From Swiss-Prot:
Pfam family, one: DMRL_synthase
Name of the protein in its database record: 6,7-dimethyl-8-ribityllumazine synthase
NCBIfam families hit by this protein: lumazine-synth
UniProt organism field: Acidovorax sp. (strain JS42)
Any one GO cellular component localisation term in the record: cytosol
E.C. designation(s): 2.5.1.78
GO terms assigned for molecular function: 6,7-dimethyl-8-ribityllumazine synthase activity
Keyword presence, Transferase: yes
Reactions it catalyzes: (2S)-2-hydroxy-3-oxobutyl phosphate + 5-amino-6-(D-ribitylamino)uracil = 6,7-dimethyl-8-(1-D-ribityl)lumazine + phosphate + 2 H2O + H(+)
Function noted in UniProt: Catalyzes the formation of 6,7-dimethyl-8-ribityllumazine by condensation of 5-amino-6-(D-ribitylamino)uracil with 3,4-dihydroxy-2-butanone 4-phosphate. This is the penultimate step in the biosynthesis of riboflavin.
Alphabetized InterPro entries for the sequence: LS, LS/RS, LS/RS_sf
Pathway participation: Cofactor biosynthesis; riboflavin biosynthesis; riboflavin from 2-hydroxy-3-oxobutyl phosphate and 5-amino-6-(D-ribitylamino)uracil: step 1/2
Length: 154
């Protein structure tokens, strides 16, 4: 939920992490801002620039395929999915939102790699614009927190 109380994570340290980012180009004005906010937060959390791999795909439905290719390489401590799906006049919104989300979740479970899902789904452009920076930052923080947690649990 936008503006929700997300709680406070313990110290987030990304110094030793390798992060993969897959960004959908569709609604590029939004996804570019998501990506910039995400990258800035990763760097702020200590992830080294050289340890961030950022790739672009056409749209949200293609994000899981690229995430899978990254997960199969076993080089990343966490992955991040970035995209923006804005409701239109047809059922296509539900299809893209549901299938991209299911694909991201399935990959995280199948490969046991944390994937921060910041494929935002909104009713309109105004909602997307209001969320683009916060959700990019959130994705970076989730990726770092979950990568560290899974390392601790292994």
């Amino acid at each position: 939920m936008f503006g929700a109380d997300k709680g406070t994570a313990d110290k987030l340290d990304g110094k030793k992490l390798h992060i993969g980012i897959v960004q959908a180009r569709f609604n590029e004005n939004i996804t570019n801002t998501l990506a910039a906010a995400c990258r800035a937060e990763l760097l702020r959390l200590g992830v080294q620039e050289k340890h961030i791999r950022h790739v672009l795909v056409p749209g949200a439905l293609e994000v899981p395929v690229a995430l899978q290719a990254m997960a199969e390489r076993d080089e990343y401590d966490a992955l991040i999915a970035l995209g923006c799906i804005i409701r239109g006049e047809t059922y296509h919104f539900e299809l893209v939102a549901n299938e991209s989300g299911a694909g991201v979740t399935r990959l995280a479970l199948d490969y046991q790699v944390p994937i921060a899902n910041a494929i935002i789904t909104t009713e309109n452009l105004e909602q997307a614009l209001a969320r683009q920076t916060e959700k990019g930052v959130d994705a970076a923080r989730v990726a770092v927190e979950m990568a560290n947690l899974l390392e601790e649990l292994s």
